[in-house]
């Protein structure tokens, strides 16, 4: 506690992560000690509160209505394939890890996507459409549905585009 206060407080807060009252209390104590609490970040956060330099990174599992298995899946995906670049990249890469609309909405509201650029209002207005579009694409791919353009070769596509231009 004396020699490693940041590490100690991160471990202490993580130990009571299921108790919102205790978590809030220890976060307040941590701030009073002069230790900065960094906001949740989809590319930096972990299952528990973690040390980031001289500060503590807010745990992704402390975000309300997002389960531990979902967070573990997100962290595993990030470790396997690198940081997420944007909201669409996040949704595509975590679709098979039980990340649903509600979880994405809660991440947005908590500020976990703030480091990706854009703002929360923008993300809130588009996240549902992004998820629906990706789910629709996956459903079509799983059903084996392909468009005629998927099987056409490059010459056929150019032929069609030329005929379409002439028709106008």
Language-model features: where?
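Noncatalytic, beta-rich nucleic-acid-contacting surfaces in large DNA/RNA-processing enzymes
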Residues: 1-168
């Amino acid at each position: 506690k004396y020699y490693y206060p940041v590490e100690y407080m991160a471990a202490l807060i993580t130990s009571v992560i299921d108790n919102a009252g205790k978590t809030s209390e220890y976060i307040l104590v941590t701030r009073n000690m002069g230790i900065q609490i960094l906001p949740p970040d989809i590319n930096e956060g972990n299952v528990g509160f973690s040390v980031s330099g001289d500060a503590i990174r807010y745990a992704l599992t402390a975000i309300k209505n997002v389960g531990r298995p979902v967070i573990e899946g997100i962290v595993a995906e990030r470790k396997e394939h690198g940081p997420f670049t944007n909201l669409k990249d996040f949704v595509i890469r975590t679709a098979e890890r039980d990340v649903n609309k509600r979880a994405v909405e809660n991440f947005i509201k908590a500020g976990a996507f703030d480091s990706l650029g854009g703002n929360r209002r923008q993300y809130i207005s588009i996240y549902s459409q992004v998820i629906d579009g990706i789910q629709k694409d996956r459903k079509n791919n799983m059903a084996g549905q392909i468009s005629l353009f998927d099987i056409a070769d490059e010459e056929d596509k150019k032929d069609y585009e030329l005929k379409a231009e002439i028709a106008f």
